[in-house]
Structures are given as structure tokens and as C-alpha cells.
């Protein structure tokens, strides 16, 4: 087991509610780490509708999903949160009163006094492409997110998909990889036009390959890939060298391992009390779309409210001997100093 990373609060989910929780906790001198299965912050806002306008954030007539994410990231800068992206929490164990040990699928271990679940509708799970035997290579040669770019250096990399993730990683890994082959079922891409133009320029100059079709088979042994077969739309089959494969077929929402953490559930949601949005396990809170209570409305602004009340209760666990004096950012010089505005 790796050495534990110690923090006051561990937030599971780096969407808007998780990000704003950092702000509310930071005002109370509570440090936070955040874990998200996605390879970027913003949750559904950034992943599913980055350009979609949002009209119901108080005081902001219109903001896009990505715009809101960017503003929240700017707002929490003074508190220097640490992000662990492309990781999924697998286990939450109680080790003290208060105290929890949290383990991710990347083998990281955290020890904290409070856990905040801000995971939206659950964890995003990558869609597995329908390639026979692909499971044998997952985690060794087939990856659904890029954690360390360096592992792709001098490798023959096959990237499958036609959206922003596929094109972004095609362009980002191209300078490192021995050869990039992008595979998409049609010669029409959903990615940003500029990214598509860059990719086509690389193909035209012979610096990477584009194949229209689908990966139909994999070759290798002991979890190590050697080649991939690509079936074209004309039913022709081509075999290309493949050391690593990155399929980007989109994401589905699943409750995931939350069901194994000993927390009471109700219709795949986490019931909470409404004074601080604490779950059935003291010290574990749930805010945002993943929780449920009488009168619950799934709005971002409601999640912000839940985060503010959660932070007040979390302070009792982190600083049990310290009396909390409520202050306003408009008038408190100490809070303004924390925010860097005084």
C-alpha cells in the first residue's frame, strides 16, 4: 500500500458543487483534495455541455458550462486545492472518529477527517468498444483516460473515436508517440473544427494515419498489445502495429462503487439530513445531484447552498476544539486576506 496522502477533507467529484465546496471549506481554513474519474475538472458541465448556456446561476444571466467551470476554478485559486483526475474511488473505510481511509483505482490512499461526495449522478464510466477480448488488455495496453503522457512515448498508439477527447489526445500525443493511428467509423468528426484541421494536416504530411472503419480484433499476449485489426466500411481488413489503444466512445453514468461504502441508499441516490447534508455515516456528506431529501431540486444553485451548510458541519470534525465564528466576506478582513483582496 502506498503512503497515505493526508488532508482535512476529500471531495469525490470535481464538478461545480465539488469546486464550490472547496471555496466554502477554504474560508474556514479547511484543506481539500478532489478526485474525479474524468481527466479534467467541471463534471457534467465541462464533459457533456461545455458550450451549452446556463441561465439559472444567481447574478449571472448566462454562462456556459465551461465558463462556469473556469470561473469556479478562478474563485478557488486562493485555497490551492489538489486534484487527482482520471481516478475513481474504490474504497472508503472508517479508521477513526472522525477519520476515513480512501483508496482509488490508481492505488492512491488518502486519510482524511471528512469525505464529501459531490459525484453528480454517479461516476462517469467509459463505454467499452465491442472488440472481442479487449478486457484482457485493459489497464496494461488499453486505457480510457490518459494519466501519464510519458507512457506513450515511442509507442504505436491507436486512438479510436471522433469527438474532442479523441482529437485532443491525437494532437497531444503525436509528438511523443512513434506513430499515431486515428480510427473513426466515418470521415466526419464531432470535435472542434480547428482540431480536425490540425489532424488532417498531420495526415496529409504523412506524420500520422487516419483509418475510416472500426477496430475489429486485437493481437497480443499477457495483456500486452502488438497489433489491431481495422475493418473498413468496405469490409476490407487492415492490421496495424499497436502497442497502446485509447478508445473514446463516450461515457455513461453509473452509481459505481458508492454502493459498497456502507452508506444508506435510496433509489440509487444518497439520502441526507438537511441541516448539513450528512449521510447515514457521520463525517460523510453528499451534495449536489447525488443526494436526495424531501423537496430536493436538482439545480446547481441548490448544490452550492448544500456545500455552504456542509462546510459549517465539517468544521466541527476538522477542528473539534475550535469554536466557529461566522463571518461575511463583505466585512471580514481575515476572510478578505484569505481571498487575496485585502
Curated annotation (Swiss-Prot):
Name listed for the protein in its UniProt record: Ferredoxin--NADP reductase
EC code: 1.18.1.2
Record family assignment: Belongs to the ferredoxin--NADP reductase type 2 family.
Catalytic reaction(s) noted: 2 reduced [2Fe-2S]-[ferredoxin] + NADP(+) + H(+) = 2 oxidized [2Fe-2S]-[ferredoxin] + NADPH
Keywords carried by this UniProt record: FAD, Flavoprotein, NADP, Oxidoreductase
InterPro entries: FAD/NAD-bd_sf (IPR036188), FAD/NAD-binding_dom (IPR023753), Fd--NADP_Rdtase_type_2 (IPR022890), Ferredoxin-NADP_redctase_2 (IPR050097)
Domain of life: Bacteria
Enzyme's top EC category: oxidoreductase
A molecular function GO annotation: flavin adenine dinucleotide binding
Cofactor binding, per record: Binds 1 FAD per subunit.
Record keyword Cytoplasm present: no
Residues holding FAD: 17, 36, 44, 49, 89, 124, 289, 330
Cross-referenced Pfam families: Pyr_redox_2 (PF07992)
SUBUNIT field: Homodimer.
Reported cofactor(s): FAD
Amino acid at each position: 500500500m502506498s503512503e497515505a496522502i493526508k488532508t482535512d477533507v476529500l471531495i469525490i467529484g470535481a464538478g461545480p458543487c465539488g469546486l464550490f465546496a472547496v471555496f466554502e471549506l477554504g474560508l474556514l481554513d479547511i484543506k481539500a483534495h478532489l478526485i474525479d474519474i474524468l481527466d479534467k475538472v467541471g463534471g457534467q458541465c465541462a464533459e457533456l455541455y461545455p458550450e451549452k448556456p446556463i441561465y439559472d446561476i444567481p447574478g449571472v444571466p448566462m454562462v456556459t458550462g465551461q465558463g462556469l467551470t473556469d470561473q469556479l476554478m478562478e474563485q478557488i485559486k486562493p485555497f490551492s486545492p489538489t486534484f487527482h483526475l482520471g481516478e475513481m474511488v474504490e474504497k472508503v473505510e472508517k479508521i477513526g472518529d472522525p477519520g476515513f481511509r480512501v483508496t482509488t483505482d490508481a492505488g492512491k490512499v488518502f486519510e482524511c477527517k471528512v469525505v464529501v461526495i459531490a459525484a453528480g449522478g454517479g461516476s462517469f464510466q467509459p463505454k467499452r468498444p465491442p472488440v472481442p477480448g479487449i478486457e484482457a488488455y485493459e489497464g496494461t495496453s488499453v486505457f480510457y483516460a490518459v494519466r501519464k503522457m510519458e507512457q506513450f512515448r515511442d509507442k504505436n498508439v491507436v486512438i479510436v473515436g471522433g469527438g474532442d477527447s479523441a482529437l485532443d489526445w491525437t494532437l497531444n500525443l503525436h509528438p511523443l508517440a512513434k506513430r499515431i493511428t486515428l480510427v473513426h467509423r466515418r470521415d466526419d468528426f464531432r470535435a472542434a473544427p480547428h482540431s480536425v484541421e490540425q489532424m488532417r494536416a498531420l495526415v496529409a504530411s504523412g506524420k500520422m494515419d487516419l483509418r475510416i472503419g472500426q477496430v475489429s480484433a486485437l493481437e497480443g499476449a499477457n495483456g500486452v498489445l502488438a497489433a489491431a485489426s481495422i475493418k473498413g466500411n468496405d469490409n476490407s481488413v487492415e492490421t496495424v502495429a499497436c502497442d497502446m489503444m485509447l478508445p473514446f466512445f463516450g461515457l455513461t453514468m453509473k452509481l459505481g462503487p458508492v454502493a459498497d461504502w456502507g452508506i444508506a441508499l435510496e433509489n440509487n441516490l444518497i439520502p441526507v439530513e438537511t441541516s448539513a447534508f450528512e449521510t447515514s455515516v457521520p463525517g460523510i456528506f453528499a451534495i449536489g445531484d447525488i443526494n436526495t431529501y424531501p423537496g430536493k431540486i436538482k439545480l446547481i444553485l441548490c448544490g452550492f447552498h448544500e456545500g455552504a451548510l456542509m462546510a459549517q458541519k465539517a468544521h466541527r470534525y476538522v477542528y473539534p476544539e475550535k469554536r466557529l465564528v461566522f463571518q461575511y466576506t463583505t466585512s471580514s478582513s481575515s476572510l478578505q486576506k484569505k481571498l487575496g483582496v485585502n
